[in-house]
């Protein structure tokens, strides 16, 4: 069992990583006997895990209600958020309830925002079931829903009480979702840890076949890196912005193509190559390093070019609505070397468009 603590004073919380955690009531601490829980999951995951998690919580004396949400990024919306509020109010659940997010990034982000908002804030626990949510979205307290004009535009910083990562969930993950998660894994190596990127080059095949020790190390290292950044910059005023490598481009793809048509990790993968090409054009990143990124993403089964039907010009309106924009200027996360990156303002739109075009015609 791996255990990492995100140290944020009185809001500190553990990340527990192991197989078989759904069999142990102690995995869901700080829940105690007699407490109320609203378990939030999705239509795909409910048949797989709802009864199991409900059973282990009830075994611990916890009173469990549940709400099942439709699947897909397109449902990370205010309308679906309202169904969670309605379920909470119909019981009714008070401020002493705990929301448990059993699912991937959509369920986790939406449930976290529900917890931040309901009666001005109730406790919640993240139980991520996809690789992407295990290594990234469940850690750090970013919660949100989408708006038709932009991804994650309505949300809050709100930390969970704990994160429970059961590695067994990955056994039911479709290959495309596994690849999507690997995009975020590879991101950590590019922006923060060159040695981890080297390890990924050597061990990607083991991750693709869900080798237990390799996957446990991979998830632990990603969570360690994410925790270090969150502790240093919880509300993304500086360092934490680096975690958005590829996201400014990727969010534009998701919004333009329609949420759910490109998985988040797929869009981020293409966006990371666009960021690398931008950095190349600025003379601060080598084509050889870009090729290492492209090779690793391709081996993981991820796209390295943007959608053919989306012109370079179509990116700009979305990028100008990005949450990192300051004084009307796009801020980009750009690699300087494998394992080192920066937040860069003032890059000309022409250069950015040319970098996007590099990835459209490649």
UniProtKB/Swiss-Prot annotation:
Location relative to the cell: Cytoplasm
Keyword ATP-binding applies: no
Residues reported to bind NAD(+): 71-76, 105-109, 129-130, 142, 151, 169-172
Positions of disulphide bridges: none
Main location: cytoplasm
Tagged with keyword Cytoplasm: yes
PANTHER family to which the protein is assigned, alphabetical: 3-DEHYDROQUINATE SYNTHASE, 3-DEHYDROQUINATE SYNTHASE, CHLOROPLASTIC
Role this protein plays: Catalyzes the conversion of 3-deoxy-D-arabino-heptulosonate 7-phosphate (DAHP) to dehydroquinate (DHQ).
Family assignment from sequence similarity: Belongs to the sugar phosphate cyclases superfamily. Dehydroquinate synthase family.
Protein name (database record): 3-dehydroquinate synthase
Lineage: Bacteria, Pseudomonadati, Pseudomonadota, Gammaproteobacteria, Enterobacterales
